[in-house]
């Protein structure tokens, strides 16, 4: 159960206002209102950049990627509430909101129905829903991505390119990794096209801890300064993680206590701790890390927070953004050391692995996901 519920609330008053408490958050008994304020404050303090600026001709626009999971929906809810508070106090807001949902070919949810509900509940913002195959249409340097699609006379449309690319991937981890990477690329392009200066990701502390270990395990640890920290990204946009100080179980408690129908907008297969697939063939690195941290946060939340706090201390080199970039994930690769042997690795998946990737501009992590056949067929 998210949070430690208090059986006898009269014996455990809220530590902040002395009203009857409803749960214990990190050893602190809190009432309903103080807990809601706790979540809001954790999020809003990360948005000092978007305070009301009376001298600005127009407010900056931010993009909120929606997955209809607990974190992204809660983030939109808190941002909408924060905007209303700004407007009631100053007559204007500090930022404009755009939201986008990327259709996942491996998920089947009623996205349009959920998006209509979100539009109705949080009106006044811009909303969009994009198919993932639009990444082949919108990415300006799409030739680099298209070169990773197996050559076939039938792969002429964006839909076909995506199908062939996904079908060419040899493991569940590879498919999950590439799909996530393509989603990020598409979200970034949509942000640029809609005039957004920043992307506000809904990653909780738990999610960022998961990402820290999974990206490292997949060979993309060098990208962590941009994947878990607030600030400029290699894409020319600012990345922000407003929920970075909130555990997923705290977001679940917030959702369950919300009085605005927040729960009806959330579509997650499992609200509690994730259970990994019983089949090792279908289990991904992301699944394992998600299962681990969602179970650890129940009794040892400080471990989860420490992982994120430590990863956030990582800094990219000053000239990192001028380095050559990976064709797939678009992350800067130090010294252009692409592929397995560029990083001095000695892992091989078969004969001629080094020559297969020798001329490919894909990083170590992406090299592990993209099969040999794909790269060798399109090698330069």
Curated annotation (Swiss-Prot):
Gene Ontology biological-process entries: protein urmylation; tRNA thio-modification; tRNA wobble position uridine thiolation; tRNA wobble uridine modification
Cellular compartments annotated: Cytoplasm
Pathway(s): tRNA modification; 5-methoxycarbonylmethyl-2-thiouridine-tRNA biosynthesis
Example of a GO cellular component annotation carried by this entry: cytosol
UniProt superkingdom: Eukaryota
Molecular function GO terms recorded: nucleotidyltransferase activity; sulfurtransferase activity; tRNA binding
Keywords annotated in UniProt: Cytoplasm, tRNA processing
InterPro entries hit by this protein: CTU2, Rossmann-like_a/b/a_fold
Role noted for this protein: Plays a central role in 2-thiolation of mcm(5)S(2)U at tRNA wobble positions of tRNA(Lys), tRNA(Glu) and tRNA(Gln). May act by forming a heterodimer with ncs6 that ligates sulfur from thiocarboxylated urm1 onto the uridine of tRNAs at wobble position. Prior mcm(5) tRNA modification by the elongator complex is required for 2-thiolation. May also be involved in protein urmylation.
Family, per entry: Belongs to the CTU2/NCS2 family.
Stored PANTHER family: CYTOPLASMIC TRNA 2-THIOLATION PROTEIN 2 (PTHR20882:SF14)
Annotated protein name in UniProt: Cytoplasmic tRNA 2-thiolation protein 2
